[in-house]
Amino acid sequence: MKFKNYFFAAAMAAALCGCAEQKPANPLFSDFTAPFGIAPFEEITVDHFREGMLKGLEEQKAEIEAIINSTEEPTFENTIKVLDQGGELLRKVRGTFGPLSSGSATDETRALQKEMSPIFSAHSDDIYMNQALFAKVKAVYDNKAKFNLTKEENTVLQNIYDRFVDSGALLNDEQKAELRKLNTELSMLQLQFGQNLTHETNKT
């Protein structure tokens, strides 16, 4: 009886493993191989988009933490370039989701937009209002002459520095909290306006 139970348990475990292995992989985590890098939209579900967005957020958070916790002198390469080129998965997922959230939007995609909009707003504020991160950016900005940057690199540095300032990096804690609240409200209003506009456009 013990042997029968053992083999039954082993068979069940193998079956469960087989089911897990058969679960379709998220297409957003693989390279798009179609011509011109077109996404395989027919294979991507709303759950895939949600999973991709959340993973992309976590990856970018890890990149930001690595910059902040680095003991190296802030430079264009280890700070500005990482900020400029980081968040690759998040950009890919949001860029792929974009067309589906406009003309071909469904109730599911609209619901995902509403779910993620305040999360994206908070994520952006967490980056651009982060005092420790801005200190690294400012250190590169204030000492840019010694880095012998190219014209393009200077432009990237200026744009990123301005983005931090425009997004509230120089505000005090109370002002930042108020701006965060306004940003969240604005993101939801912009989303609602966009969804209403799409709805009316599709009716005509």
What do the PLM-derived regions correspond to, one by one?
Residues 2-20:
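Gram-negative bacterial Sec-dependent N-terminal signal peptides
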